[in-house]
């Protein structure tokens, strides 16, 4: 039995998580939120089928703290134990993420957090940007020691369209030994937030972060996954370094595009809020950005460019909002999504994503998969004859789902979230694991420093730390590919295998039967961030019995960390 604690119950949690709990009949045992919200939460839960759900509150004075107070943490843990909580989902304002991640991991709980992983106040300051990066690595250390799992809700990890794209890219990169050479990512969510909206707490700007840390994080995550695909290539095609040049469009910039007088003119037939009468020329000093634009380059060890990328992430795009009175900021304030991805593998392959909405979720009809529909998502493949005689292929996302899956669904992105939640609650796979976010965090960190540079009137390129002890150590798909393809013509049958993730490398122990030559082979396989991939301590046996004994010995060695000799061998390889 899975018993869930939900931390934070705002518009996003209500639409996504509570819908999922009702649909899948999941036990929501506990909601945690601020004391000021207690009555509203109780009313909402009672009216929506969660009368048995308990509520735990903490004082509003702690909402911006980095750590839960000791007494609050102790009381919350006691409640979680009483209710036998097995999984914890964090859906608070991101400033509170760290305290609950710390609480969950220290107490060996399975935890899922919304993106971004953490933020701090005053995110235009270098101190806060450094703090967010530092917090990520602190969470990693906690996750290493914890018996619980830790995942980040980036639902495109389970989006069938993007899964297909990653599969095709991986196949072409590996087969033709050609890297992804260009990635262009555009996303607009048409969030027209007007001057009187900018003090909001939900997806705020006033703490110094905007689009990049709002929905932008999904595309940082996506970009990092694309870059990792190139890592199967070695030699001069191996990416070891990167940098980014950033520009942003700020709320103050927007006031020069759309002034207070413009608002009065556009909405002259509506009741204008007092804000516009009292603030003729408002300023938003060091508020978060409306739009983020980044030019990224990734280099080999000689300093030559392997991959270029562009990020165009905007709030300041076409919207359906035609009213000045504020509605729900999450999905009912005129937001519409435009998403476009363009990926090149040199002259061999071009993949494009086109996903364009023209209406709000509340205007859903039965026909939503055409251009302009809520579920429009098409993938185009343009092929060089060297890789595919068919010059063009097209996939409609809806064709990848059954009619049964489409019943009672909120959208394809939401189906992806459902798959994520299913796998999180059942510990099925490692997608979205906190340990796989290091490259995304390093890219985010450098992009955020670029925003700081603009606010500080500095014009400079920021380095991206592409390789450290974490950024490439947990790429499950690539590791699986490596092991599956390892001398496939000779190793058709794996009898046993064991995988151990270390800080800077991954160890496998394999017991395989080489059918064509009628012997068993047992070895340790190594994949590490120093570009080493090799087999160690290999032995061959005619006897299955002795092969298995040797396999168990190697399994014991790596499982019990008796690995000093192996580490020396790894060092000698590098």
Walk through the language-model features, giving the residues of each.
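N-terminal glycine-/serine-/threonine-rich beta1-alpha1-beta2 phosphate-ribose binding loop
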Residues: 1-107, 121-137, 479, 483-487, ...
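Rossmann-fold dehydrogenase core element
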Residues: 129-155, 183
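Predominantly a Rossmann-like dinucleotide-binding segment in NAD(P)-dependent oxidoreductases
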Residues: 156-260, 427, 454
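Glycine-rich, aromatic-lined ligand/substrate-binding cores of catalytic
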Residues: 207-360
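C-terminal helical cap and adjacent loop that interface with cofactors, partners, or active-site loops
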Residues: 327-484
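Short N-terminal "domain-start" leader segments
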Residues: 479, 483-528
């Amino acid at each position: 039995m899975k018993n869930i604690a939900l931390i934070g119950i705002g518009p996003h949690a209500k639409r996504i998580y509570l819908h999922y709990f009702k649909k899948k009949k999941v036990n929501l045992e506990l909601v945690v939120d601020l004391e000021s919200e207690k009555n509203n939460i109780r009313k909402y839960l009672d009216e929506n089928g969660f009368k048995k759900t308990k509520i735990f509150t903490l004082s509003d004075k702690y909402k911006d703290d980095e750590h839960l107070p000791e007494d609050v943490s102790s009381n919350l843990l006691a409640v979680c134990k009483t209710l036998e909580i097995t999984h914890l989902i964090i859906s608070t304002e991101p400033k509170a993420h760290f305290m609950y991640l710390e609480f969950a991991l220290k107490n060996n709980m399975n935890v899922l957090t919304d993106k971004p992983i953490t933020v701090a106040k005053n995110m235009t300051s270098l101190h806060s940007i450094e703090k967010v990066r530092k917090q990520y690595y602190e969470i990693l250390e906690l996750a290493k020691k914890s018996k619980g799992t830790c995942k980040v809700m980036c639902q495109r990890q389970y989006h069938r369209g993007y899964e297909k794209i990653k599969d095709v890219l991986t196949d072409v990169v590996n087969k033709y030994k050609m890297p992804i050479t260009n990635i262009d990512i555009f996303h607009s969510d048409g969030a027209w937030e007007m001057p009187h909206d900018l003090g909001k707490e939900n997806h705020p700007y006033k703490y110094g972060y905007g689009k990049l840390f709002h929905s932008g994080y999904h595309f940082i995550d996506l970009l990092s996954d694309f870059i990792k695909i190139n890592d199967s290539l070695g030699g001069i095609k191996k990416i070891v370094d990167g940098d980014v040049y950033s520009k942003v469009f700020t709320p103050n910039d927007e006031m020069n595009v759309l002034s207070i007088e413009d608002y009065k003119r556009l909405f002259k037939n509506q009741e204008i809020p007092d804000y516009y009468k009292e603030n003729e020329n408002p300023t938003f000093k060091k508020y978060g950005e409306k739009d983020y634009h980044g030019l990224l380059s990734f280099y080999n060890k000689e300093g030559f460019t392997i991959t270029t990328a562009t990020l165009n992430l905007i709030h300041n795009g076409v919207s359906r909002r035609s009213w000045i009175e504020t509605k729900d900021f999450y999905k009912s304030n005129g937001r519409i999504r435009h998403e476009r991805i363009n990926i090149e593998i040199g002259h061999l392959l071009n993949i494009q994503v086109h996903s364009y909405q023209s209406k709000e979720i509340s205007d859903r009809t039965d026909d939503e998969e055409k251009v302009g529909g809520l579920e429009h998502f098409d993938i185009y493949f343009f092929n060089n004859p060297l890789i595919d005689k068919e010059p063009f292929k097209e996939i409609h996302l809806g064709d990848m789902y059954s009619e049964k899956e489409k019943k009672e669904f909120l959208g394809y992105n939401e189906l992806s979230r459902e798959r994520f939640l299913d796998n999180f609650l059942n510990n099925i796979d490692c997608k979205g694991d906190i340990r796989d976010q290091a490259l995304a965090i390093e890219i985010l960190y450098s992009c955020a420093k670029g925003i700081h540079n603009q606010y500080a009137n500095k014009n400079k390129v920021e380095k991206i730390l592409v390789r450290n002890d974490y950024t490439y150590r947990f790429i499950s798909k690539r590791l699986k590919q490596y092991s599956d393809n390892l001398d496939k013509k000779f190793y058709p049958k794996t009898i046993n295998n064991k995988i151990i993730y270390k800080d800077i490398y991954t160890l496998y122990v394999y017991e395989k039967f080489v059918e064509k030559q009628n012997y068993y082979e047992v070895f340790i396989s190594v994949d590490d961030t120093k570009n080493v991939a090799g087999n160690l301590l290999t032995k061959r046996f005619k006897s299955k019995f002795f092969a298995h004994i040797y396999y168990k010995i190697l399994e014991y060695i790596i499982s019990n960390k008796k690995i000093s000799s192996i580490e020396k061998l790894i060092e000698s390889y590098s």
